Amino acid sequence: MLSEQQYRYIVRILGTDIPGDLKVPYGLALVKGIGVNLAYALCRLLGIDPNKRIGFLTDAEIEKIEKAMANPLAIGIPVWMLNRRKDYETGKDLHLVGADLIYYVKRDIEREKRIRSWRGIRHALGLKVRGQRTATTGRIGMTIGVRKGKK
């Protein structure tokens, strides 16, 4: 084990503070846009032990992770693991993390609303978008109790 001085209680990766006591894949999964499967793939391709704690990562390893997430295809991440394939504007395969992901999703929803597609209309009305039933579930607002009638 490394000495106490080399352990960090909080590690900042891709703009997210991660507790140092988590294992690398589960710590990386706290970054918006990275799931556990992608984190395990990153560990395997970058040669980082997945059982290692995030707090024991060196600066070089953290930099490797950040560079890999900037261009995941370059290190061998398969295209199907990316979260934005065939981007609407550029046509490129991208993987977005953090604030970029939030911004692009919000922009996509606004575009759907603007072109008045079915999805956009559902978003605008605050209804379910993906074909779920709405008769009994997904009700919003205060619940009103049923009052018992007089006997």
UniProtKB/Swiss-Prot annotation:
SUPFAM superfamilies recorded:
S13-like H2TH domain
UniProt entry tagged with the keyword Transcription regulation: no
The record, for InterPro entries, names: Rbsml_uS13_C, Ribosomal_uS13, Ribosomal_uS13-like_H2TH, Ribosomal_uS13_archaeal, Ribosomal_uS13_CS
Swiss-Prot/TrEMBL keywords: Ribonucleoprotein, Ribosomal protein, RNA-binding, rRNA-binding
What's the short name of a Pfam family annotated to this entry? Answer: Ribosomal_S13
Q: Which PROSITE patterns match?
A: RIBOSOMAL_S13_1 (PS00646), RIBOSOMAL_S13_2 (PS50159)
- Disulfide connectivity? none
Similarity comment: Belongs to the universal ribosomal protein uS13 family.
Its subunit composition reads: Part of the 30S ribosomal subunit. Forms a loose heterodimer with protein S19. Forms two bridges to the 50S subunit in the 70S ribosome.
Q: What job does this protein perform?
A: Located at the top of the head of the 30S subunit, it contacts several helices of the 16S rRNA. In the 70S ribosome it contacts the 23S rRNA (bridge B1a) and protein L5 of the 50S subunit (bridge B1b), connecting the 2 subunits; these bridges are implicated in subunit movement.
Q: What is this protein called?
A: Small ribosomal subunit protein uS13
